[in-house]
């Protein structure tokens, strides 16, 4: 019974980590730029990046870029 409970706890923790990894978290860099990990579908998703910067982070700027899946604005 303890073994089954331990497995349940581990699965619950993994599930929580996976959900939080898919949330868009706005982070400000030391240079004042905003970054959003996993904010771009690909390196060309600048419009999606711009939308996230404005709606999710409440951050407006004239330039947005995607490097891999990371959004910079």
Swiss-Prot record:
Main location as per UniProt: secreted
Localisation: Secreted
Signal peptide: 1-21
Keywords: Ion channel impairing toxin, Potassium channel impairing toxin, Secreted, Signal, Toxin, Voltage-gated potassium channel impairing toxin
Residue stretches in coiled coil: none
Purpose of the protein: Salivary protein that inhibits host voltage-gated potassium channels Kv1.1/KCNA1, Kv1.2/KCNA2 and Kv1.3/KCNA3 likely via a voltage-independent pore-blocking mechanism. Suppresses expression of the Kv1.3/KCNA3 channel in lipopolysaccharide (LPS)-stimulated mouse macrophages and human T-cells. Down-regulates secretion of nitric oxide (NO) and inflammatory cytokines, such as TNF-alpha/TNF, IL-1beta/IL1B and IL6, in LPS-stimulated mouse macrophages in a manner dependent on Kv1.3/KCNA3 channel blockage.
Anything else known: Exhibits anti-inflammatory effect in mouse carrageenan-induced paw edema assay. Attenuates delayed-type hypersensitivity reactions in a rat model. Reduces migration and invasion of NCI-H460 cancer cells.
Name the record gives this protein: Salivary protein FS48
Source species: Xenopsylla cheopis (Oriental rat flea)
